From Swiss-Prot:
Residue ranges occupied by any PPIase FKBP-type domain in the UniProt entry: 163-248
Lineage of producing organism: Bacteria, Pseudomonadati, Pseudomonadota, Betaproteobacteria, Neisseriales
Origin: domain of life: Bacteria
Keywords: Cell cycle, Cell division, Chaperone, Cytoplasm, Isomerase, Rotamase
Family, similarity comment: Belongs to the FKBP-type PPIase family. Tig subfamily.
Record-level GO BP terms: 'de novo' cotranslational protein folding; cell division; chaperone-mediated protein folding; protein transport; protein unfolding
Molecular function via GO: peptidyl-prolyl cis-trans isomerase activity; protein folding chaperone; ribosome binding
GO terms for cellular component: cytoplasm
Protein name: Trigger factor
Location(s), subcellular: Cytoplasm
Domain-level remarks: Consists of 3 domains; the N-terminus binds the ribosome, the middle domain has PPIase activity, while the C-terminus has intrinsic chaperone activity on its own.
Pfam families named among the record's database cross-references: FKBP_C (PF00254), Trigger_C (PF05698), Trigger_N (PF05697)
Biological role: Involved in protein export. Acts as a chaperone by maintaining the newly synthesized protein in an open conformation. Functions as a peptidyl-prolyl cis-trans isomerase.
Amino acid sequence: MMSVTVEILENLERKVVLSLPWSEINAETDKKLKQTQRRAKIDGFRPGKAPLKMIAQMYGASAQNDVINELVQRRFYDVAVAQELKVAGYPRFEGVEEQDDKESFKVAAIFEVFPEVVIGDLSAQEVEKVTASVGDAEVDQTVEILRKQRTRFNHVDREARNGDRVIIDFEGKIDGEPFAGGASKNYAFVLGAGQMLPEFEAGVVGMKAGESKDVTVNFPEEYHGKDVAGKTAVFTITLNNVSEPTLPEVDADFAKALGIADGDVAKMREEVKKNVSREVERRVNEQTKESVMNALIKAVELKVPVALVNEEAARLANEMKQNFVNQGMTDAANLDLPLDMFKEQAERRVSLGLILAKLVDENKLEPTEEQIKAVVANFAESYEDPQEVIDWYYADTSRLQAPTSLAVESNVVDFVLGKAKVNKKALSFDEVMGAQA
């Protein structure tokens, strides 16, 4: 193979000019046309018997284009291997104006290469190791939440209070005119739950079933309904029903409802503590991992290939559309989401992917089989039949990609915590459970 010069363009972009001998192009084109001749069905000729000259007239140009495309791909691959180029994404091929060699056809390949990743001094980085504990108070708090989730509402003949579920008819008018979405019959909501605007809810408090009243409501400027944002409406409200909440007792029936077959309340509390502890551990680990990843981003100055960022942004856009579809928004599949809204997140993900790959390779942080099994077992623990979940993962090794990635990240976190300046941060139960994770 002739030597090829790799031209350095901007940032990670490179360019090579590929020379394709016309003799090779013509020979491959002839071969392709003969293959076409054997299967061509042309009026006036038996299948496969049309003259080659006619086949060349009909299909010659497209056959030559196909051959050139195939040879360009093959030649670029050969050059990348010979020059030890770490190509990121797919190359872009362009014609070369100066076709000064009659013996060959020239094509320029423009592409990006992976950056050289150099991990900085991790001992200079600060990371937060987040901790939290789960005791009796946290179990009590969780049990109370579980009770509220099983609230029953019973009809009462009294004035409506916060916490009651009310059923109302209402009609709203702005400047004396009804507006879209401003009226409903037998609408149910819980007072104080924030389902309605504060002035609306305050107007219902103190009413009794059968009563009607007018309530003035000022829509905030930032209200999601643009047609009414910043405007004042008068709602005529009729209260049809008031029901007060009744929480279940923490007894054997309650324990059975939570899956404790014999209704043992102590066992139920232990199960609650185990589940809550697992979730708290997951969340504090996520926050610690986020701190570690931020430290790695700071420790490495890195230019990332635009091609990889664009690919990741497109993947994130498709993921968002699929999530919308899964939520019942069937038309979301056709949404044209601008990739720019995903670029920052995509660039961070690509950067971390490159950094982690380097860190894992340099420091032998690949997970062991036992570590992967532990991650799978942790996944399975929250299901009714853990072994069934474990068997599902191991029935198809491609399903182990997610557990393997988590095991890798865990090893990276432990490695960085052993190198960086670690600041321990204890969070309360509410702080942990209120965090997005």
